[in-house]
Design a protein with these regions (language model features):
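N-terminal amphipathic/basic-hydrophobic helices that include classical n-h-c signal peptides
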Residues: 1-13
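Intrinsic structural disorder/low-complexity segments
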Residues: 5-8, 24, 340
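N-terminal type II signal-anchor transmembrane helix
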Residues: 11-50
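Short low-complexity stretches enriched in small and charged residues
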Residues: 19-23, 50-55, 91-93, 133-134, ...
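Signal peptide-directed extracytoplasmic domains
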Residues: 44-202
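Bacterial extracytoplasmic/cell-wall-associated proteins, especially those involved in peptidoglycan
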Residues: 60, 144-148, 159-354
Length: 354
């Protein structure tokens, strides 16, 4: 055998070593694959309840991993980092709110994050929100845009022209209900959604009733907001609405106590005194004639319907009942009204309410 020539035995030995190396490499790959798969099934939520993962516009893969680490099982971040690295997640960071149920796997949440499959926000607009500031705070607490961004839109006279409202009549567009939007939605998009819903609410039948009452849709909502604050008794709402419509038709000032509270921003007042009536404000209906320039709260649909279907009666006065039931005594004459007012005042005094 010449020098340097490989024997058949040596060739078989080399082939055997290569096979061993390939086997070990394959085993390692399978182990890594199995480990990756196992990591993919680790829960992204260890809290035992549904939690929301908020991804901001300036988040990076590392900051997302940090947020997941606060709620996920041990090693969940390791699995998520692997998926992010392989898929180049850094180029696909989608802002949004992602609700994670208990037991949701890292792989499943990764797929949602990479695809930007947000969880819709159930945005509840409650009745009786009193000011645009309170409305902005409510929206800012539930959506990505903060209250300052909402107030900037609410005061943007150019933007509001699209909806034919100003800051005073803007609340008319927000009909109390539950809406589905994404957390990242732009404020102007929400306003367009509210406007569309508002236009849908005002059917031909409702518009006819508004005209018969001598009111525009915005005026109906404004009067409904006063009714909303005057009584929580659903059966009494049409009576209250009818009383105010009677006063409007007779050219009388509304003299609605809730408008004084709104003008003062003193919503805790339990007793309106003469000193309170002196406030100079277009919302103080003891001073101004007709309706205030806009709603004093977001009225419920039932309050709006009570104005459209107001009770026909002769009453032009009302006073809270002395039994503090939340309902009212109605009167057609000032003398009867004074008698009702004296009884209520005496009841306040007896309870030490000032």
């Amino acid at each position: 055998m010449q020098k340097g020539q490989t024997t058949p035995f040596a060739v078989r030995k080399m082939n055997s070593n290569k096979k061993k190396q390939l086997f070990i490499l394959a085993a390692l790959c399978l182990a890594l694959l199995a480990g990756g798969v196992s990591l993919g099934f680790i829960s992204a939520n260890r809290t035992g309840q549904t939690v929301s993962l908020f991804v901001d516009a300036d988040d990076t893969p590392d900051s997302v991993l940090y947020k997941v680490d606060e709620i996920g099982e041990p090693f969940s971040v390791l699995g998520l980092r692997g998926f992010m690295t392989v898929s180049r997640y850094g180029a696909h960071v989608h802002p949004g709110r992602y609700d994670i149920d208990p037991g949701t796997s890292i792989y499943r949440i990764f797929r949602r994050l990479r695809a930007g499959q947000q969880t819709p926000v159930r945005l509840v607009i409650p009745a009786s929100l009193r000011t645009v500031e309170a409305l902005a705070a409510k929206l800012g607490a539930n959506l990505q845009a903060d209250s300052a961004a909402w107030m900037a839109l609410f005061r943007d006279t150019v933007a509001l022209k699209e909806f034919k409202v100003d800051t005073s009549t803007l609340p008319c567009l927000f009909i109390p209900d539950t809406y589905e939007v994404f957390w990242t939605v732009e404020p102007i998009v929400v306003l367009r959604k509210m406007n569309k819903n508002y236009r849908r609410f005002w059917t031909d039948a409702r518009l006819v009733k508004a005209r018969e009452a001598g009111l525009s849709p915005y005026e109906v909502v404004t009067l409904a907001s006063i009714v909303e604050q005057e009584t929580a008794n659903e059966a009494e709402k049409p009576m209250v609405a009818g009383m105010y419509i009677n006063r409007l038709r007779q050219g009388m000032k509304l003299q609605a106590d809730p408008t004084v509270k709104f003008a003062l921003r003193r919503f805790d007042l339990r007793r309106i005194l003469h000193e309170h009536l002196a406030v100079e404000s277009p919302y103080n209906t003891y001073h101004v004639e007709g309706l205030p320039p806009g709603p004093i709260c977001l009225p419920s649909k039932s309050s709006v319907e009570s104005v459209l279907n107001y009770a026909r009666h002769p009453y032009i006065y009302m006073c809270a009942k002395e039994d503090f039931s939340g309902t009212h005594n109605f009167a057609a004459t000032y003398a009867d009204h004074l008698a009702n007012a004296r009884r209520y005042s005496a009841a306040l005094d007896s309870r030490g309410i000032k």
